[in-house]
Amino acid sequence: MLKDGIGFDRVIVCCGRVDLRYGIDGLSSYVRLHYSLNPIEKGTLFLFCGTRADRIKGIIYEGDGTTLITKRLSKGNRFQWPRTPDEAKELSKEQYRLLMNGFAIEGTIREFHAEKHEKAPGTDTGILEKSS
């Protein structure tokens, strides 16, 4: 169910770290209080990740009740979880699939440092040649 994306219409990732000791009531309250979203919106999966990033929890309201889902990855594996606190993001089916398969869903922009990429004097390639 989780890896295939079957059984729900929308996926909302609750970014940052959440105490995974919470159950259905605690996670539902978290969604209401931190994101002002409705945790009993039918067909919407809310996902949460803890500090270790090797496990996630999800809640989904199915019309007649709420289901609590837990997934723990094998030793050495981690979810690439967005860590921006106080933010909830809706994922496309493709982003969800990438997340469940261990890929990051957010790109990282790194600062460019020109001094690390300067060309060596007298060369076009930027590669220092060994003198004989």
Residue ranges and their predicted role:
Residues 1-132:
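Polybasic/polar functional segments that serve as interface/processing modules
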